[in-house]
Curated annotation (Swiss-Prot):
Function: Conversion of NADPH, generated by peripheral catabolic pathways, to NADH, which can enter the respiratory chain for energy generation.
Location(s), subcellular: Cytoplasm
Cofactor(s) for this UniProt protein: FAD
GO biological process, one term: 2-oxoglutarate metabolic process
GO molecular-function term, one example from the UniProt record: flavin adenine dinucleotide binding
A Pfam family assignment: Pyr_redox_dim
Biological source species: Pseudomonas syringae pv. syringae (strain B728a)
Protein name: Soluble pyridine nucleotide transhydrogenase
GO cellular component: cytosol
Record key words, sorted: Cytoplasm, FAD, Flavoprotein, NAD, NADP, Oxidoreductase
């Protein structure tokens, strides 16, 4: 067994692992990266964020072509199969892998492909993909192994008609009807993708509202948009059993209902990838969801072991994971780059997009904060009329006395980009965080950014 010595070993090359490895390397540490795949990038690049967003982009282009009257001169609406749109996602994945591989090489981070597990608090045994076992010894170790879809034991995921959010990328046909169980972020995003391909979607939600953490008006807008686009949402339903057939699948619900479709996509929960890490060898224990507990510096109960990304739970976003990994390494090497990552924008890539940051109306009402609301509807924006993306709105919540911006919520095209203007103002200290910025600033015209000015005037006009 070959033995290699490092200052830092990072387990997992997703966003959290990458952020950690790069920051530690920039601080002059000798760093090794271990990943169970034969390529870097983690689930985010290969099965999650990147392929699903690439799929969404392709589907959105198809929708634009099929709904724009200008293109009728070219021909009738055209439809593409799921495997067809998947080809573009595969090209994006290859480009991402190439880029990220170059990052590690440029920063002189050694990458080991294989399954890593703790031998003790300072040693990692790596069973490489070629079967060779190598030992990595390090002063400090960061766990960034991510998560995977939760799979109930009573569901046969080997059945050819039953998928989860990892295996759905192997779907070789376009189903006429699809059941999606679980209406969280992943479930809603795939509901948009498949409905955009003309698939009838049954979206089964075990709660009474879609994405209940969102501002209720935004959640309602998504529900309304789904109902107009081949998505049947069923709230307050729980599965009793899943019956796989040769020609489809039947979902039996505890309410007594039965739903039949060509395929089922399971999107109900995720579990941390900790079961093969040998945590018992260092006295560390994961919770029931496979997640490990860390403090505000991302340190676990083992003093030289840190955690970041999905494996530590909330908020389970790629954007936050990268910052958590970078901050964990910053805490570890003490180079001033540590921060506790808690003020994170939400980006949900449905069609149209949803994004938000800060408080929603329910939270402000519960806290008895005197707030006011300003809105800008995209249908009245010149840029939206030009692009044909007229569905959506920008909503700003602000303190009616100090004019401090308290929350920004957006539903519509480019929402995940638009929200960052509000985020930048909300991060300003003291009186610099004010609605006055939006009315005293000249925005390019026509842009979607000027929705902030429209929403600001709308809100300020409500004051008395």
């Amino acid at each position: 067994m070959a033995v290699y010595n490092y200052d830092v070993v990072v387990l997992g090359s997703g966003p959290a692992g990458e952020g950690a490895a790069m920051n530690a390397a920039k601080a002059g540490r000798k760093v090794a990266m271990v990943d169970s795949r034969r390529q870097v990038g983690g689930n985010c690049t290969h099965l999650g964020t990147i392929p699903s967003k690439a799929l969404r982009h392709s589907v959105k282009q198809i929708i634009q072509f099929n709904t724009n009257p200008m293109f009728r001169a070219i021909g009738e609406p055209r439809w593409f199969s799921f495997p067809d749109v998947l080809k573009n996602a595969e090209m994006v994945i290859s480009k991402q892998v190439a880029s990220r591989t170059s990052y590690y090489a440029r920063n002189r981070v050694d990458v080991f492909f294989g399954t890593g597990s703790f031998a003790d608090e300072t040693s990692i045994n790596v069973v490489c993909t070629n079967g060779v076992v190598e030992k990595l010894v390090a002063n400090q170790i960061i766990i960034a192994t991510g998560s995977r879809p939760y799979r109930p034991a009573d569901i046969d995921f080997s059945h050819k008609r039953i998928y989860d959010s990892d295996t759905i990328l192997s779907l070789g046909h376009t189903p006429r009807k699809l059941i999606i169980y679980g209406a969280g972020v992943i479930g809603c995003e795939y509901a948009s993708i498949f409905s955009g391909l003309g698939v009838l979607v049954e979206l089964v939600d075990n709660r009474d509202q879609l994405l209940s953490f969102l501002d209720s008006e935004i959640s309602q807008a998504l529900s309304y948009h789904f109902s107009n686009n081949n998505v049947m949402v069923r709230h307050n339903e729980e599965y009793e059993k899943v019956e796989g057939l040769d020609n489809g699948v039947i979902l039996h619900l505890k309410s007594g209902k039965k739903i039949k479709a060509d395929a089922l996509l399971w999107c109900n929960g995720r579990t941390g990838n900790t079961d093969k890490l040998g945590l018992e060898n260092i006295g560390l224990k994961a919770n029931g969801r496979g997640q490990i507990e860390v403090d505000e510096t991302y340190r676990t109960s083992v003093s030289n072991v840190y955690g970041a990304g999905d494996v530590i739970g909330w908020p389970s976003l790629a954007s936050a994971a990268y910052d958590q990994g970078r901050s964990a390494a910053g805490s570890m090497v003490d180079n001033g780059s540590w921060r506790y990552v808690n003020d994170v924008p939400t980006g949900i890539y449905t069609i149209p997009e949803i994004s938000s940051i800060g408080k929603n109306e329910h939270e402000l009402t519960q806290a008895k904060v005197p707030y006011e609301v300003g809105k800008a509807f995209f249908k009245g924006m010149a840029r939206a009329q030009i692009s044909g993306e007229r569905v959506g709105m920008l909503k700003i919540l602000f303190h009616r006395e100090t004019l401090e911006v308290l929350g920004v919520h957006c539903f519509g095209d480019q929402a995940s980009e638009i929200v960052h203007i509000g985020q930048a103002i909300m991060s300003q200290p003291g009186e610099a965080n004010t609605m006055k910025y939006f009315v005293n600033t000249t925005f390019n015209y026509p842009t979607m950014a000027e929705a902030y000015r429209v929403a600001a005037y709308d809100g300020l006009n409500r004051l008395f």
